[in-house]
């Protein structure tokens, strides 16, 4: 190989080896510097002693809360589970150094169990450890400033009011403070007035409306010292879409099905069947959604009140339907209609409810036609009476020879004289008398049947009026009862 080409190939290779060797030496130097730094910082360090130069001075701890997830809200056990990051910032004078002595190293990550930490705990913790585990590392700056941000999952106790479930709001708090150090030893300062929600994952059931923090100085009965705590209040609102679609709307439909019971005619025989079917469907529905409703005896939730209202609604409709059917099938042989029933249910309420019987309308039309025709026939009344008398005399003389004429002419006189009077005061053959008696029996029987049918129709009409009354009553109760129940959360918010 040519010497010049060999030299050109060797120069880049030697440069790469030189760069790698320099980097290795630099890394080795940095590792040695960091090792010297750790040895210098922790060789005589005691993590159990408060990092203050003067014993009377407090350690100022800056505290901030960041929430990443609202995991669960247990209404029955009154527990709120959250995933949090707790940021602690304080200064430890014993860990200060000059970065120039250690190759410019300004930040080091140190195990949290090797340094002193403020014993900040969650006062209202319900399940698990009250204190944060020190398995994460802390960031140590050259001037002794320590930033420690451990993650934690807390299950905090939260008194809950589910009166307006599922349109309820809850106010849950997290109270942090030192468990053993009073304000003279540790002074907590809050960073900002709000919870950091930059890394928050939205919850499918709850929405955080507001999350504010406050500092409190409290003197407890057990001790004379004043203790400092920082309390974060989470004002959360339940998203009611799931319960509205799967709980409230089906109950609303069941309520309106109950209203339709009173629109169903009594003659169809399906009124009680429809009522029982609605009641059974509501019962099955309640068994399905029992686990969805918070099981508590402290208060009755709003949706529980609505379900109870619907159950009473359906049960009452069954009772009223049985009563209406009892009235519908009454007859003159079993019941006598009182006068007040006729006045109220046959005259007064139908006018109020804008109901009108077809027979009454026909009677009105006939009476109008009669009044119009009475004026035309008044002038011919005397002539007709004279003609009837003459015809009567002729029939008495020749009643045997003109039997056919007797039948045709007496049709007009049946409305003026009874058949009984005719049979007693007129001499007829036995055959004619039998015919008259039979006709009289048939007429009386038909009259009795017509009277019975009129009374039965009156009872049926009374039942129809009662149905119409309760139809409007149940519509009003259903609309205003439903609106009144679900307007309560809006009124409570205002």
Curated annotation (Swiss-Prot):
Cytoplasmic side: 328-468
SUPFAM superfamilies found in the cross-reference section: Neurotransmitter-gated ion-channel transmembrane pore, Nicotinic receptor ligand binding domain-like
GO molecular function: acetylcholine-gated monoatomic cation-selective channel activity; transmembrane signaling receptor activity
Primary localization: membrane
Keyword terms: Cell membrane, Disulfide bond, Glycoprotein, Ion channel, Ion transport, Ligand-gated ion channel, Membrane, Receptor, Signal, Synapse, Transmembrane, Transmembrane helix, Transport
Region of interest (Disordered), residue spans: 364-390
Bilayer topology annotation: Multi-pass membrane protein
Catalytic reaction(s) noted: K(+)(in) = K(+)(out); Na(+)(in) = Na(+)(out); Ca(2+)(in) = Ca(2+)(out)
One of the record's GO cellular component terms: presynaptic membrane
Locations listed in the record: Synaptic cell membrane
Listed Basic residues bias regions: 366-390
Disulfide bonds: 158-172
Activity regulation details: Activated by a myriad of ligands such as acetylcholine, cytisine and nicotine. CHRNA6 nAChR activity is inhibited by the antagonists alpha-conotoxin MII and PIA, a small disulfide-constrained peptides from cone snails.
Transmembrane segments: 241-265, 272-290, 306-327, 469-489
Family: Belongs to the ligand-gated ion channel (TC 1.A.9) family. Acetylcholine receptor (TC 1.A.9.1) subfamily. Alpha-6/CHRNA6 sub-subfamily.
Function: Component of neuronal acetylcholine receptors (nAChRs) that function as pentameric, ligand-gated cation channels with high calcium permeability among other activities. nAChRs are excitatory neurotrasnmitter receptors formed by a collection of nAChR subunits known to mediate synaptic transmission in the nervous system and the neuromuscular junction. Each nAchR subunit confers differential attributes to channel properties, including activation, deactivation and desensitization kinetics, pH sensitivity, cation permeability, and binding to allosteric modulators.
Subunit structure: Neuronal AChR is composed of two different types of subunits: alpha and non-alpha (beta). CHRNA6/alpha-6 subunit can be combined to CHRNB2/beta-2, CHRNA4/alpha-4 and CHRNB3/beta-3 to give rise to functional receptors. Heteropentamers containing CHRNB3 have an stoichiometry of (CHRNA6:CHRNB2)2:CHRNB3. Interacts with LYPD6.
Protein name per UniProt: Neuronal acetylcholine receptor subunit alpha-6
């Amino acid at each position: 190989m040519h010497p010049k080409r060999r030299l050109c190939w060797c120069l880049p290779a030697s440069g790469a080896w030189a760069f790698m060797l320099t980097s290795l030496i630099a890394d080795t130097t940095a590792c040695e510097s960091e090792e010297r730094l750790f040895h210098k910082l922790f060789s005589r360090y005691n993590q159990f002693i408060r990092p203050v130069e003067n014993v009377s001075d407090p350690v100022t701890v800056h505290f901030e809360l960041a929430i990443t997830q609202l995991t669960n809200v247990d209404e029955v056990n009154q527990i709120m589970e959250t995933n949090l990051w707790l940021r602690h910032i304080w200064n430890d004078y014993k860990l200060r150094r000059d970065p120039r002595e250690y190759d410019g190293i300004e930040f080091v990550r140190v195990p949290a169990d090797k340094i002193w930490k403020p014993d900040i705990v969650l006062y209202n913790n319900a399940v698990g450890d009250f204190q944060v585990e020190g398995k994460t590392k802390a960031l140590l700056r050259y001037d002794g400033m320590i930033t420690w941000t451990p993650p934690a999952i807390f299950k905090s106790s939260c008194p809950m009011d589910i009166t307006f479930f599922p349109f309820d709001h809850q106010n849950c708090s997290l109270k942090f403070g030192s468990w053993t150090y009073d304000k003279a030893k540790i002074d907590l300062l809050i960073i900002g007035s709000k919870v950091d929600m930059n890394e928050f994952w939205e919850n499918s059931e709850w929405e955080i409306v507001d999350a504010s923090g406050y500092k409190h100085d409290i003197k407890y009965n057990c001790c004379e010292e004043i203790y400092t705590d920082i309390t974060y209040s989470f004002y959360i609102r339940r998203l009611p879409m799931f319960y509205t679609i799967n709980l409230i709307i089906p109950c609303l439909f069941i309520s309106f099905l109950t209203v339709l019971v009173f629109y169903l005619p009594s003659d169809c025989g399906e009124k009680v069947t429809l009522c029982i079917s609605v009641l059974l469907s509501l019962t099955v529905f309640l068994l399905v959604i029992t686990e969805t409703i918070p099981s508590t005896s402290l208060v009755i939730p709003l949706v529980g009140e609505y379900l109870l209202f619907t159950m009473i609604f359906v049960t009452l409709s069954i009772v009223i339907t049985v009563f209406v059917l009892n009235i519908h099938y009454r007859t003159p042989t079993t019941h006598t209609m009182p006068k007040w029933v006729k006045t109220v249910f046959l005259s007064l309420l139908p006018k109020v409810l804008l109901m009108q019987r077809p027979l009454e309308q026909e009677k009105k039309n006939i009476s109008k036609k009669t009044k119009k025709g009475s004026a035309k026939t008044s002038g011919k009344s005397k002539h007709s009476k004279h003609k009837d008398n003459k015809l009567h005399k002729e029939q008495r003389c020749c009643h045997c020879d003109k039997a056919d004429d007797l039948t045709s002419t007496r049709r007009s006189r049946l409305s003026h004289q009874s058949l009984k009077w005719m049979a007693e005061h007129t001499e007829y053959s036995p055959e004619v008398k039998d015919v008259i008696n039979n006709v009289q029996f048939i007429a009386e029987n038909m009259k009795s049947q017509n009277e019975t049918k009129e009374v039965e129709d009156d009872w049926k009409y009374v039942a129809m009026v009662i149905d119409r009354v309760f139809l409007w009553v149940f519509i009003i109760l259903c609309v205003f009862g439903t609106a009144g129940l679900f307007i309560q959360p809006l009124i409570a918010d205002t």
